Amino acid sequence: HPDNEGVQEPTLDDLLQRAARAKVVGIGETGLDYYRLGERSVADMEWQRTRYRTHIEAARRTDLPLVIHTRSASDDTLAILREAGGFKGDSASRPVARGVFHCFTETAEVARAALDLGFYIAFSGIITFKSAADLRAVVGFVPLDRLLIETDSPYLAPVPHRGKTNSPAYVPWVAKQVAEL
């Protein structure tokens, strides 16, 4: 997870070895999170960008999907994906453009860019929050065959369970909200 600064990060070789295990079905959660910069600048987040690039390369080499987290960092998140190449319409390199932007909280423009790169968009209990009207508008923009729902457990329980520990048992509230849109 992008918030795990200081955690010993596996090398690309480590990731490739781990990904070879039969139970491994994806690479991530990876991405960029600039939400809590505090006194630091975006330049101080180079460790996140380096880690993200390593995970993208692991996905490319293993042909596994990426699980991408982006928060207050969508421009860099998308730019690094594009730099990596191998995306939809790029026949010169092996496709890596599969995976999901999980717990999506960005704009319709970011959703369009992610969809154009071949990714799915997943929404969590946040879409049930009163304050998430803009995000609910994005839900309506995502094609149903590219839309996923999730818990992001143990966080972000949907209304009427907001503030409690989230659980997969609460996914029906997210599905209900999507259906109503």
Question: Where do the protein language model's features map onto the residues?
Answer:
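Mid-domain alpha/beta scaffold segments of enzyme catalytic cores
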Residues: H1-L181
